[in-house]
């Protein structure tokens, strides 16, 4: 198998490039846009020449205060380091494109699995606890400026299935931040940091309307497999997943973003509740982010409403439906222009066939099956405090209703307090 790198040396080298000059001049640490600054002018010069370094850290601490499995705390973290090569600037060419290289590392412990027992992760950055290559891609326009093509090794969720505005990452639960989880839970769809070989096309009809189409390899054996961390080619390709997405962005007045999407994975899958195979599985989704109010007295202060509705294959997906809605207030106070207040509600519906299988297994073993609701529900409230241009602190509270809806376990509703720390390196 082709391996891009054999160990963590690439991640350490990239981290060293970003962090070594970090504190050469720490006097402006509270004012600069990144923690490590401009590296004595080197960083800006490299970007002007066509090489842009980026780095992001997120740390999430959660404490289960009531209900769930037990009272305790857990911490998880994500470190992302990347470099973008602008070939136009580097070689003096026109429309030569860009190359993106990204490495990711995750560490920590599972708040949902250890403390709550629910399906929707209370830490959006938990999972796949190892260092990996997460993107090696090439992007450029083709034939016309309206058509953008990207190909290589990348997470399909980087460009599809989520709101471009990023409004949902004002929350810490993975049910909100990212993409509807029934996409990846019931097909070959992959979200960051899981990457696959693929190609993505974007065609802009005008500034408001766009269509996106992609095709990605499906390789279940590489999911969460640290031995595949640096391998680009699939270990065992079972099929191809093809998403199609229509995007509308309201640009005048109160801004808005709307996405209507469909996807299909032609891999064979086992039908839930039997040994039969299903030829393919798919789903569809609707996403929206709409500003509904904007202050006339305070520039930048606005109230947004968001919504998600997603359905997956009823034959082969254990996670059949996801709905969410909520509000985000930007600039809650005149003195806090970059802060946010977010309140959201989500409902995750397990496949009824999965519940039937759980009930049948319990009866076959002479056990009673608990009386459970037909969905796991989530209420989350957070406050995003922009401490410096590069540092965000987000205290958070989550209330998980029916945590055992997916596992078929009788678990008390859980109250979880959390703190998310995000830093641009």
For each predicted feature, which ranges?
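Short loop/turn motifs that connect adjacent beta-strands in outer-membrane beta-barrel proteins
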Residues: 25, 30, 37-53, 86-99, ...
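Signature for the C-terminal beta-barrel architecture of outer-membrane proteins
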Residues: 182-313, 329
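Outer-membrane beta-barrel "beta-signal"
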Residues: 411-425
């Amino acid at each position: 198998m082709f391996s891009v790198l054999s160990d963590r040396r690439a991640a350490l080298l990239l981290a060293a490039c970003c962090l070594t000059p970090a504190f050469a001049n720490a006097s402006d640490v509270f004012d600069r846009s990144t923690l490590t600054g401009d590296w004595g002018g080197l960083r800006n010069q490299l970007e002007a020449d066509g090489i842009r370094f980026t780095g992001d850290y997120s740390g999430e601490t959660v404490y289960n205060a009531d209900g769930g499995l037990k009272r305790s705390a857990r911490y998880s973290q994500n470190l992302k380091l990347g470099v973008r090569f602008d070939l136009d600037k580097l070689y003096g060419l026109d429309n030569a494109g860009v190359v993106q290289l990204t490495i990711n590392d995750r560490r920590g412990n599972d708040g949902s699995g250890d403390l709550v027992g629910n399906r929707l992760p209370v830490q959006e950055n938990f999972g796949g606890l190892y260092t990996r290559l997460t993107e090696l891609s090439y992007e450029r326009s083709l034939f016309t400026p309206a058509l953008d093509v990207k190909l290589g090794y990348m997470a399909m969720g980087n460009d599809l299935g989520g709101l471009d505005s990023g409004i949902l990452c004002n929350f810490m639960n993975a049910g909100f931040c990212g993409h509807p989880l029934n996409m990846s839970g019931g097909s070959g769809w992959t979200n960051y940091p899981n990457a696959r070989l693929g190609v993505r096309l974007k065609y802009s009809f005008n500034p408001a309307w766009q269509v996106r189409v992609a095709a990605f390899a499906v390789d279940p054996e590489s999911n969460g497999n640290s031995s595949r961390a640096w391998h680009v080619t699939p270990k065992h390709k079972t099929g191809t997943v093809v998403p199609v997405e229509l995007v509308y962005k309201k640009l005048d007045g109160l801004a808005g973003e709307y996405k209507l999407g469909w996807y299909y994975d032609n891999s064979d899958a086992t039908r839930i509740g039997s040994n039969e195979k299903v030829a393919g599985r798919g789903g569809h989704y609707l996403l929206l982010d709409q500003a509904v109010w904007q202050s006339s007295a305070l520039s930048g202060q606005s109230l947004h409403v968001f919504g998600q509705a997603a359905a997956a294959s009823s034959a082969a997906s254990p996670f059949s439906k996801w709905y969410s809605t909520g509000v985000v207030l930007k600039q809650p106070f005149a003195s806090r222009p970059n802060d946010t207040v977010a309140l959201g509600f989500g409902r995750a519906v397990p496949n009824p066939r999965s519940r039937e299988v759980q009930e049948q297994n319990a009866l076959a073993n002479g056990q009673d099956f608990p009386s459970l609701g037909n969905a796991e529900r989530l209420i989350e409230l957070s406050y995003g405090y922009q401490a410096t241009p590069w540092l965000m602190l987000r205290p958070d509270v989550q209330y998980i209703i029916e945590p055992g809806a997916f596992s078929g376990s009788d678990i008390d509703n859980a109250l979880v307090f959390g703190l998310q720390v995000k830093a641009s390196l």
